[in-house]
Amino acid sequence: MEFRVVISDPKTGRAYQKVVEGANANRLIGKQIGDVISGTIVDLPPDYELKITGGTDRDGFPMRPDLPGTARRRLLLSGGVGFRPKEKGLRKRKGVRGRVISKDILQINTVVVKHGKVPLEEIFKQKEE
């Protein structure tokens, strides 16, 4: 099992991708949107902390923070995650995924809440070379 973790850095406005496999991927299962995880899960130094902000499953359905569990549901949405109405009052039934990470999730979006000593730019430059 593997997850693609997108790490957004609010200081620089850049985002970095990291594939997480094996034991570290298993540590992510059961976490929810809003949980803070250690940077060691995605091979960052231990002084980094990441907050889970969302994600998508293998079919492209977005995770919605107000939907409990791991199941996929078809909800009548008037806005927010999964639907952007073109005009006021528009509602539509859309498929979304619950807020808990399961084996069906493919991409996990995170944001850095605690920065470490080494900037992310240097960490990801070293790994690209």
Curated annotation (Swiss-Prot):
GO cellular component: ribonucleoprotein complex; ribosome
UniProt entry keywords in alphabetical sequence: Ribonucleoprotein, Ribosomal protein
Classification via InterPro entries: Ribosomal_eS6, Ribosomal_eS6_arc, Ribosomal_eS6_CS
Coiled-coil annotated spans: none
Example of a GO MF term: structural constituent of ribosome
Keyword Metal-binding in record: no
UniProt entry tagged with the keyword Ribosomal protein: yes
GO biological process, one term: translation
PROSITE patterns xrefs: RIBOSOMAL_S6E
Pfam family, one: Ribosomal_S6e
Protein family according to the UniProt entry: Belongs to the eukaryotic ribosomal protein eS6 family.
Protein name according to UniProt: Small ribosomal subunit protein eS6
Organism in which the protein naturally occurs: Archaeoglobus fulgidus (strain ATCC 49558 / DSM 4304 / JCM 9628 / NBRC 100126 / VC-16)
